[in-house]
């Protein structure tokens, strides 16, 4: 039996960490803007009889922080692996962003709509803004990959 050297992987974590850091800022800003400018007022208008609809308190912010962290990590990892596999063309980038958006936000909002917890107007506002958010996020990952 002979012992052979195992070659070290040439994968660099720095571009992925840069993309994750930038997306932590971008996605959090986008989520906060979309929520405060559109979703929260629309939810309160649509469901005035529900107490505590779209509340603003510490437990909500803590859950939102967990949501944003999972969202950023998922988007960055899925985008990185997909761009590595399918290429970094603009077409691939937009398609990957659209796929991640459909997997997260379309399912979320359709579920809320199906349970009568969202109106068509909320969907028609939140979904396009979320699509822009995720396509930009995937472009950030692409930029970081190509920069390496």
Which positions does each model-derived feature cover?
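Juxtamembrane/disordered regions of integral membrane proteins
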Residues: 1-148
């Amino acid at each position: 039996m002979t012992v052979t050297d195992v070659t070290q992987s040439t994968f660099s974590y720095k571009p992925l960490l840069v993309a994750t850091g930038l997306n932590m800022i971008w996605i959090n800003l986008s989520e906060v803007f979309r929520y405060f400018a559109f979703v929260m007022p629309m939810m309160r208008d649509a469901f005035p009889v529900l107490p505590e609809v779209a509340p603003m308190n510490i437990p909500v912010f803590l859950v939102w922080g967990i949501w944003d962290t999972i969202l950023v990590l998922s988007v960055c990892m899925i985008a990185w692996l997909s761009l590595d596999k399918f290429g970094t063309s603009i077409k691939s980038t937009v398609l990957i962003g659209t796929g991640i958006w459909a997997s997260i936000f379309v399912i979320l909002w359709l579920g809320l709509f199906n349970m009568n917890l969202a109106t068509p107007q909320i969907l028609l506002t939140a979904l396009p803004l979320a699509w822009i958010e995720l396509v930009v996020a995937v472009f950030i990952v692409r930029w970081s990959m190509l920069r390496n």
